[in-house]
C-alpha cells in the first residue's frame, strides 16, 4: 500500500509541477526560470507546513507522510526536501552543516548540470 501511495502522490506532484510551471512561463516568458522558482519556493513552503503539521501537531498515520511528502512533494520538487534538510540541520544547531549543504548542493548541482550538458554535446 505504501508504494502505491508514494507513486500516486509522486505522479500527482509531477503533474502539478508541470502544469503550474508551464502556466507561469507561458504568461511571463522563459527568459528567467520563474515557473521553476515558483514551484521550488512553493514546495519549500509546503514541506515546512506539512512536516511541521505531520510531526508536531497532527501525528497521523505514517502513510500520510509517504503520500504527501515523499510522493507529492517528491514529484513536485526535490528542492523542498533539500531545504527541509538544511532547515533541520540549522535548527538542531548545525549552522555549518546547513551552510555546507547549501553551498555544496548548489555548486555541485550546477557543476553536474554543466558536465551533463557537456557530455550530451559530444
Curated annotation (Swiss-Prot):
Alphabetical keyword list: Cell inner membrane, Cell membrane, Ion channel, Ion transport, Membrane, Metal-binding, Sodium, Transmembrane, Transmembrane helix, Transport
Chief place where the protein resides: membrane
Binding of Na(+), residues: 74, 77
Presence of the UniProt keyword Cell membrane in the record: yes
Molecular function as annotated in GO: fluoride channel activity; metal ion binding
Lipid bilayer topology: Multi-pass membrane protein
UniProt subcellular location: Cell inner membrane
Pfam families, A to Z: CRCB
Annotated HAMAP family: FluC (MF_00454)
Protein family per UniProt: Belongs to the fluoride channel Fluc/FEX (TC 1.A.43) family.
Designated name of the protein: Fluoride-specific ion channel FluC
Amino acid at each position: 500500500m505504501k508504494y502505491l501511495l508514494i507513486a500516486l502522490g509522486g505522479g500527482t506532484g509531477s503533474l502539478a509541477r508541470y502544469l503550474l510551471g508551464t502556466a507561469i512561463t507561458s504568461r511571463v516568458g522563459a527568459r528567467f526560470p520563474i515557473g521553476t522558482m515558483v514551484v521550488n519556493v512553493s514546495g519549500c513552503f509546503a514541506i515546512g507546513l506539512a512536516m511541521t503539521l505531520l510531526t508536531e501537531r497532527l501525528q497521523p498515520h505514517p502513510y500520510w507522510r509517504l503520500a504527501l511528502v515523499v510522493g507529492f512533494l517528491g514529484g513536485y520538487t526535490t528542492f523542498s526536501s533539500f531545504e527541509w534538510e538544511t532547515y533541520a540541520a540549522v535548527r538542531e544547531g548545525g549552522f555549518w552543516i546547513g551552510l555546507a549543504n547549501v553551498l555544496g548542493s548548489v555548486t555541485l548541482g550546477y557543476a553536474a548540470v554543466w558536465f551533463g550538458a557537456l557530455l550530451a554535446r559530444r
